[in-house]
Amino acid sequence: MGILRFVLLISLNLVLFGFKTTVSQPQQQAQVPCLFIFGDSLVDNGNNNRLLSLARANYRPYGIDFPQGTTGRFTNGRTYVDALAQILGFRNYIPPYSRIRGQAILRGANFASGAAGIRDETGDNLGAHTSMNQQVELYTTAVQQMLRYFRGDTNELQRYLSRCIFYSGMGSNDYLNNYFMPDFYSTSTNYNDKTFAESLIKNYTQQLTRLYQFGARKVIVTGVGQIGCIPYQLARYNNRNNSTGRCNEKINNAIVVFNTQVKKLVDRLNKGQLKGAKFVYLDSYKSTYDLAVNGAAYGFEVVDKGCCGVGRNNGQITCLPLQTPCPDRTKYLFWDAFHPTETANILLAKSNFYSRAYTYPINIQELANL
């Protein structure tokens, strides 16, 4: 097992050290015609801005390093999907669906919403948000909008959508803002780790299948990262006598159960359950673990604290309006109590695009070229 991890790290180093933590200028033409994004605050780029929600990031210093400033992204600069869109060659970032007008929908849309989950009630403790079911329904509406630009020719629209990439990153909030919040939700009483993961997978299968029914053929499905080790959890467990370390391993163990089921789901979908589709699984748990454990190799000096936040690990309270963040965000793995920095997002996007170290069964570049 140690040899395997060594080989993975060497391969990732070869990928990452061949690049700076910037994304090159887009190519003349994008490798795919459009990119559709479904997810939570890790990839939300402004859909929550006008909602009555605590899950918003439309204030400084969020966006301090982003060319357009504060937009609603939950980081200092680009999100993972921003970096991915640039690598794919898009001239502009994929806009939030809440602000798309006219033919812009033909290049894709971002439906992601902070606090969203696979389950509809997930994130209700934080206020309004757009759940995965709601995001999928918004996408079906978008498909109807797109049809007019194909003169009502559904076959032509299907051929167009079959060349696009669909990204889905869900599950984190189903644990952080549902299963492991017993004072607000009853799921931990009604389920155990195994049955809760099975329930999520059942719902997720239906959601991904509906995307397929409305044209999705090249689909990226991410696992959940090592969220038991984010600054918020480290702050809570910092002073506890925990023989396994400062992370909340109870959460991590539950995530491993879920991720195992997501990877199996990808296998099932690729083996003919959805004809003509190709799904790629991103192992976010392994990639975030390796970035944290080997942070110095990737230029990170701080891997256990947020760049912006309050309290232990800058994780007891997340980044506040007009708070002064750390001066050099490139040295931090985490931007706030929950979310990675732009630097981490770019590293992860590049590794997933060019390497199979954390992708299965192929990488994103190979998916785009299908």
From Swiss-Prot:
EC number annotated for this UniProt entry: 3.1.1.-
GO cellular component, one term: extracellular region
Keyword set includes Hydrolase: yes
Major site of localization recorded for this protein: secreted
SUPFAM superfamilies named among the record's database cross-references: SGNH hydrolase
Cell compartment(s), UniProt: Secreted
Signal peptide: 1-24
Superkingdom assignment: Eukaryota
Sample GO molecular function, one term: hydrolase activity, acting on ester bonds
Pfam families the UniProt entry points to: Lipase_GDSL
Active site, per annotation: S41, D336, H339
Identification of the protein by name: GDSL esterase/lipase At1g33811
